[in-house]
């Protein structure tokens, strides 16, 4: 994961200090890309320990089309707590847009089901896209989508995925996003009887919050460890039937966790 450390270093060296919605302040750069060969290991950051339970359960929660944090709370995941209302609701965030994008005639579109079918029936399509950026519902969301749009690509019987992340909290959020979309790529590949190729992360406003700079510098002093591999223990009937127990990150070794405050 030297690629990720290079992003931290790039922001520390070239970032411009900017104000932000949370009032915390950031060092920011605009436009950055990282590529991960999924055949060479699963891209979990090793220079600090990641909470893999949160990564897996959050993705399963998205795939359910869920927008209430009760499922996350039941499974010990607290990463969305700060944005939920008193009933645990977040408004029409990722899961709603992925699974039930509203149409003008009152219907809905299951973007994920559609894209899986397209990959199976027309893998050379250039329209293998899922978007969470629904302009008509942004004002109803507790947090507008940071990871806004992703696209699949099939070549040589291998599946790649590229994510566009408009706003990237590089210390806390991006390691989760890399792992989450890499996991999704593995799952979709299994459902479509494909091997995995690359996960490509493209960021817009890539920033370190000013109260994360010391933590980022600490992380840069640590030597990356070998990447783990991902084992998926069964192939369920659909993309939406996976369970937490189906996944194992084999030989995940890491340096200790580094705590940092979240900007709300």
From Swiss-Prot:
GO cellular component: cytosol
InterPro entries: Thymidate_synth/dCMP_Mease, Thymidate_synth/dCMP_Mease_dom, Thymidate_synth/dCMP_Mease_sf, Thymidylate_synthase, Thymidylate_synthase_AS
Binding site for dUMP: 21, 126-127, 166-169, 177, 207-209
Compartments (UniProt record): Cytoplasm
Enzyme Commission identifier(s): 2.1.1.45
Residue positions of the active site: 146
Entry superkingdom: Bacteria
Pathway stated in the Swiss-Prot or TrEMBL entry: Pyrimidine metabolism; dTTP biosynthesis
CDD domains assigned: TS_Pyrimidine_HMase
Subunit structure: Homodimer.
Its job: Catalyzes the reductive methylation of 2'-deoxyuridine-5'-monophosphate (dUMP) to 2'-deoxythymidine-5'-monophosphate (dTMP) while utilizing 5,10-methylenetetrahydrofolate (mTHF) as the methyl donor and reductant in the reaction, yielding dihydrofolate (DHF) as a by-product. This enzymatic reaction provides an intracellular de novo source of dTMP, an essential precursor for DNA biosynthesis.
Name by which UniProt lists this protein: Thymidylate synthase
Record organism: Legionella pneumophila (strain Lens)
């Amino acid at each position: 994961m030297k690629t990720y450390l290079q992003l931290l270093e790039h922001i520390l060296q070239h970032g411009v200090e900017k104000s932000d919605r949370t009032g915390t302040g950031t060092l920011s750069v605009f436009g950055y890309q990282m590529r991960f060969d999924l055949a060479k290991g699963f891209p979990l950051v090793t220079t600090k320990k990641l909470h893999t339970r949160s990564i897996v359960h959050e993705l399963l929660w998205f795939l359910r089309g869920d927008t209430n944090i009760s499922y996350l709370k039941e499974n010990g995941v607290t990463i969305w707590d700060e944005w939920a209302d008193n009933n645990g609701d977040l408004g029409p965030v990722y899961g709603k847009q992925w699974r039930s994008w509203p149409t003008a005639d009152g219907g809905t579109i299951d973007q994920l089901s559609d894209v899986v079918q397209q990959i199976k029936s027309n893998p050379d399509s250039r329209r293998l896209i899922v978007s969470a950026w629904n302009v008509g519902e942004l004002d109803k969301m507790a947090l507008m989508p940071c990871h806004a749009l992703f696209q699949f690509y099939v070549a040589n019987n291998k599946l790649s995925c590229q994510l566009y992340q408009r706003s990237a909290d590089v210390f806390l959020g991006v390691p989760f996003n890399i792992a989450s979309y890499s996991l999704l790529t593995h799952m979709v590949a299994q459902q479509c009887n494909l091997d995995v190729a690359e996960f490509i992360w493209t960021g817009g406003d890539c920033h370190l919050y000013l109260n994360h700079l010391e933590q980022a510098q600490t992380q840069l002093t640590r030597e990356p460890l070998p990447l783990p591999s991902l084992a998926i223990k069964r192939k369920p009937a659909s993309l939406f039937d996976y369970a937490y127990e189906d996944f194992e990150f084999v030989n995940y070794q890491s340096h200790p966790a580094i705590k940092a405050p979240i900007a709300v």
